[in-house]
Structure formats: structure tokens, C-alpha cells
Amino acid sequence: LARITSYTTIQAVYIEQPFLFFKSGGSSAATMAVLQKFNGVVSWVCYNLFDIEPQYLRAQEARKLCGIKVPRGQKAKKVVMDFILDNVPDFDVVYTRQGNPRPGYADRADSYVVAKAGLTRENQETKDSN
């Protein structure tokens, strides 16, 4: 992240807001606690590096800002990955022998969606203030 500041000016930081509730088939309390800690560290690092208070987007809000609709009964991760593969030409995915994306690629796709949603929100706010 520090290297980025050498060639560009960061004006906003958007981070995916972690889940705040349990749902059937979701992450365990331990996993959610680790994600909360990780988000806290990332928020702190971004604030210290860029002197910008991060803004948080729920995953559903980020998908909506990007125009991604998850039909009832479908897995959001798959819908997001399909959207990214269809719309981001330089997004490459490595697959397992079973044809699933290797671990980490769904997270990369989610990160792209949050970043794109943040940019969309910034552009909307700029347009609204003019």
C-alpha cells in the first residue's frame, strides 16, 4: 500500500463491512472474529498510511452499486465471480481439477466489487454536489 502513494493520490478508502450476525450455513463465531480483527488492522493501516478514515460497504450494497443481482437460490460468490469474469478482461482465475476457482480468487473478486462500488459512490457524490 505504501508504494501506491508514490505514484497516485488516494482520495477515499472503501472496505467491505464484515457480517454482524449469524446465518444458517454461514461462518462460525471464530471465523467472524478473525475477519473483524483483520478488518480492524486493515482499517488502521489505511488510516495511518493515507490519513483517510475508511468507509465501509456491506457486500449487498457493493453488489448493488456494481449492478450485480443475485437471483434467489443462487450463491452470491458464484454470481460475483461470473460477473467479474464477464466484465473485467484482465481478471484471471486459476481453477482446481474439479473446475472451481482456487482459494483466494473469490476474495479477489469481492475486493474488486468493493473497490468499484466505492468509485461509483464517489462519482455519485461528486455529481450530486455539482
Predicted regions and their residues:
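Phosphate- and other anionic-substrate recognition elements at nucleic-acid/protein interfaces
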Residues: L1-N130
